[in-house]
Amino acid sequence: MNLHEYQAKELLAGYGLPVQGGILARNGEEAAAAYDKLGGKFAVVKAQVHAGGRGKAGGVKVVKSREEAKEVAESLIGTNLVTYQTDANGQPVNSVLVCEDMYPVQTELYLGAVVDRSTRRITFMASTEGGVEIEKVAAETPEKIFKVTVDPLVGLQPCQAREVAFQLGLKDKQINEFVKLMTGAYKAFVDNDFALFEVNPLAVRENGALACVDGKIGIDSNALYRLPKIAELRDKSQENERELKASEFDLNYVALEGNIGCMVNGAGLAMATMDIIKLKGGQPANFLDVGGGATKDRVVEAFKLILEDKSVKGVLINIFGGIVRCDMIAEAIVAAVKEINVNVPVVVRLEGNNAELGAKILNESGLKLTSADGLNDAAEKIVAAVNA
């Protein structure tokens, strides 16, 4: 689950991080009032969406008057912002954050943290190249990224934070200020089950003080049951409608941009299925894992979910019967096809527990379902059917 910038800054401020001042506005009048309250010669109006690249997409603008703040806010709110991190439809802008002007600054830094799956530990990343996409820095000048891995048994140590401060070129009081900032960020990360933390840029102001100009936080959705206050911050308008519906039925769904719908049980098998579709010249329209304990109702809902995507021209169902029985899946497929008006080819590959019985159910259903012998055969058949 992602947080908006204003939510991230409020959370981080609670842990002692110095953040750029800002006021949330949901319409033009509120934006104008926010400009007046900030009291500076300039202000920055930022569209609040769950996506990066807002500046280049016109979602971050400097304003010099209350009238301009109102005008910019009204031009953004109610529209969809398309960035390099969104799909072609973009993300809806329901509010803007009117921020204090902090520029010019001495320099812009970067500070971020993720859960490194290879070390199974929280890893901080810092760089002197703030204000640009960290992916670009990693690709072009990886030597400018400093990493610190935190031992979960002892937590982030002050000496680790000081070492990062030295590498960033900070001096004197800035070092202690940065240690406090990084320590607070680590505590926030652990307390709230972050999956991602990023401040870009972390500005060094003209007076030498540090300030978080932006804030990005991703929460581990598996931990929301124990984070009720964080869960209340969820903005469902920023989520893919089908992905949101899938979560209600405990389905793991990710929308893609292809035309072959996929229904698979098991994340590994789902990824392998998408790979072989690509290998055979097709384009998967989604990642959909119905899970090892899939029920008939969940399979029916999964089928509906796939077919709600109007770009889908065919469906490949790939089931390995382990915990789940292939005959139960077959019955669910038949029920779904009968319930929904399916006008696209459907290829089914069943393997494992009761696979023969499942194939028999499909063959005797009288429906236009194509059986496949093996994953290779299934991919070839669905790609051929879609391209026919």
UniProtKB/Swiss-Prot annotation:
Q: Which reaction does it catalyse?
A: succinate + ATP + CoA = succinyl-CoA + ADP + phosphate; GTP + succinate + CoA = succinyl-CoA + GDP + phosphate
Q: Which PROSITE patterns match?
A: ATP_GRASP (PS50975), SUCCINYL_COA_LIG_3 (PS01217)
Chain residues that bind Mg(2+): N200, D214
- EC numbers on record: 6.2.1.5
Q: Which GO terms describe its molecular function?
A: ATP binding; magnesium ion binding; succinate-CoA ligase (ADP-forming) activity; succinate-CoA ligase (GDP-forming) activity
Q: Can you quote a single GO CC term?
A: succinate-CoA ligase complex
Entry annotated with the keyword Nucleotide-binding: yes
Instruction: State the UniProt keywords alphabetically.
Output: ATP-binding, Ligase, Magnesium, Metal-binding, Nucleotide-binding, Tricarboxylic acid cycle
Details of cofactor binding: Binds 1 Mg(2+) ion per subunit.
* The protein's annotated pathway: Carbohydrate metabolism; tricarboxylic acid cycle; succinate from succinyl-CoA (ligase route): step 1/1
Which parts of the sequence bind substrate?
A: N265, G322, I323, V324
Residues in ATP-grasp domain copies: 9-245
Pfam families, alphabetized: ATP-grasp_2, Ligase_CoA
Q: Where does ATP bind?
A: K46, G53, R54, G55, E100, Y103, E108
- HAMAP family this protein is in? Succ_CoA_beta
Per the record, the similarity remark reads: Belongs to the succinate/malate CoA ligase beta subunit family.
The subunit field of the Swiss-Prot or TrEMBL record says: Heterotetramer of two alpha and two beta subunits.
- Protein name, per record: Succinate--CoA ligase [ADP-forming] subunit beta
